A protein has these predicted regions:
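A short, surface-exposed loop/turn module that caps and links secondary-structure elements
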Residues: 32-59
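Enriched for short, Lys/Arg-rich terminal
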Residues: 2, 8-25, 29, 42, ...
Length: 85
């Protein structure tokens, strides 16, 4: 599988790299797991509904979520800061 980023998601990740290295490490670990097993594993993966149908979410913390979409051989990151956009 390959990993790609929406512009806003990449900016979210850059924010963590600049402000909270531990959070960035946690996100990296979740990303690796998303590439191996996109719909199971840590962070309580759950399919999203309504406007985000087709996307999945994993908990980074109580406040922040990793939101991504699996399409074929690609995992596209939509957000990694706050809740659902």
């Amino acid at each position: 599988m390959t990993l790609s980023w929406d512009t806003a998601a990449w900016e979210d990740f850059q924010y963590w790299l600049d402000t909270d290295k531990a959070m960035a490490r946690k996100i990296r670990a979740l990303l690796k797991e998303c590439l191996r097993t996109p719909t199971t594993g840590t962070g309580k993966p759950e399919p999203l509904k309504h406007d985000f149908a087709g996307y999945w979410s994993r908990r980074i913390t109580d406040e922040h979520r990793l939101v991504y979409k699996v399409a074929g051989d690609e995992v596209r990151i939509a957000a990694c800061r706050y809740h659902y956009g």
